[in-house]
């Protein structure tokens, strides 16, 4: 299960709206355990300049910097997020091929009218599997 505070969901949605019609992407920082809890997000650069409408590739330096930030805050990178402009919040074949095991992937459907659903996924041996995503109050999402 992945817990995402509502205020951080709004940050992700804002990023998706600002980047529309391109895919935006970023890192999810938080606490790992039986329940993964996202406590911070970090925007990343989409390196797929020619195909940002339907592809994303996170700049490796953003991952290095995000990992450093996470460790400084006693957190880990629990996953990544990206938007799907004018498409459902489900992994594409491209997404599934490039997903790393262990990490959670939050996908945000977005359109010219605004944001749609947000879903979470993990790569398992059998392919991408939807992960339970629970939206929590900002207070509950704080790192204690």
Regions found by a protein language model. Name each.
Residues 1-77, 85-144:
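Conserved beta-strand-loop surface patch within small alpha/beta domains used
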């Amino acid at each position: 299960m992945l817990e995402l505070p509502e205020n951080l969901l709004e940050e992700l949605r804002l990023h998706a709206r600002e980047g529309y019609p391109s895919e935006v992407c970023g890192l999810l920082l938080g606490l790992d355990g039986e329940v993964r809890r996202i406590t911070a997000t970090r925007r990343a650069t989409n390196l797929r300049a020619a195909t940002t409408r339907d592809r994303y590739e996170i700049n490796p330096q953003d991952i290095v910097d995000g990992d450093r930030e996470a460790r400084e805050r006693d957190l880990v990178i629990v996953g990544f997020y990206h938007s799907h402009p004018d498409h459902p919040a489900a992994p594409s074949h491209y997404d599934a091929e490039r997903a790393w095991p262990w990490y959670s992937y939050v996908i945000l459907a977005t359109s010219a009218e605004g944001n749609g659903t947000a879903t979470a996924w993990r790569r398992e041996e059998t392919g991408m599997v939807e992960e339970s995503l629970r939206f929590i109050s900002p207070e509950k999402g704080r790192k204690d």
